[in-house]
Amino acid sequence: MWGLCKNHFPSNKIQVQERNKALKPKKSGSEHKTKQLFPVFNCKKKEKGVMIRFAILRNANTSLLSARSICLFTQAPTYCHVRLNTLNKSITTKRNSLTESKRHVHDGKHFFTTPHQQQQTKLGEIEEGHSPNIKEEDLRSIGQAITHQRNKRRKQIWSAIFGGIFGVIIGYSLIYKVIYLKEQSFLPLFPSSKIRKLSTRDLKKVDINQVQKLSKLRVLEILSGHDMIKEQYGVPLLDKDGNSPTLNEFSMWCEDQDPCVTGIVMEPDDKRDSSHTWYRIPFVCKWRITHRPISIRGTIDDLLNRIGLETADLFEIISPERVYGSFKYEYPLQGDSHALHLWFHGEIELDDDSLIVYNGKYHVDVKLQEIDLFRREKNGQLVQYVLYKNEAGDK
């Protein structure tokens, strides 16, 4: 330290003069005399326009510690210099941060952090010894948790929707119509086929034995006038034993003309006798599963009647079923206003290789639709012969 300070504090007069001559140009007048009496130590800081000037007496006895303190003080910046440097650094930092934020503001991955900070974080984690696989597992678990939460929320929404629909339907059909209005209510469930077996109620209205006899007579009447039957089987038509042919099989079913649905019928629990089989909820209602047709025309009529109109006010439909002799007036079902057709199917065996198959509809009389002859030829091939077909009849 002494070697640093002795150059600034010369020990004799000769050294003082030589140093003053080398460092300072000569000045005229009193300024030159003053500098000979007071040798000057100049420490100039050209940075930011700051200069520090300090003068020490030539003949003063200065200790080593004092010289060291004076040297350090002359090299230290002033308060203004420190404040200017601090302000410049803060302005530069803010300018850089604003530039980076504007540059990366549209990047969704760095919404809360800048890419530079994220890279520093990743480098810090790697330096500390964290494995990148743990990061991937955490991200995967977070993604699975988010997916599970979304699925759960979606199920809750759909459950609320279906629960609301179910509550409205049950409330209107059961509570309002059955319990409050004391009326019958029908709750449709799913579509059903138009064709169905005859119920016990239908069998009470139809004499199956009569339909069977009438259909057999109509078939034998048509076959007796057919040329092929006359030539190959003869008239009157007999079976292999020489007797009148008998029916081997006969069946009947019904077919609705309108689309049908399967649903639940609910009525007030009045404990009256009925031909149907009911399931009862005590003191609430009774219900059963049934099939019902959907009449488009009847639905339109109901809607128009509710607003005070009729179909005749808008248009007039002339239906063949309204004509006398059609099904609706030949075989009306009590309590039912929809068209219902009764079909039958029968088989008559002539011999071991010949079989008569026919089908038709029954209203008041039997109406045959088709008569076929199935015969096995000598070469073993089974052949179908169409003997009669009602082209005008609709199936």
UniProtKB/Swiss-Prot annotation:
It comes from the Eukaryota. It is a single-pass membrane protein. The keyword Cell membrane does not apply. GO terms for cellular component: mitochondrial membrane. Its main location: mitochondrion. The chain crosses the membrane at residues 161-181. It is found in: Mitochondrion membrane. Keywords: Membrane, Mitochondrion, Transit peptide, Transmembrane, Transmembrane helix. Belongs to the AIM39 family. This is Altered inheritance of mitochondria protein 39, mitochondrial. It comes from Saccharomyces cerevisiae (strain YJM789). The gene is AIM39.
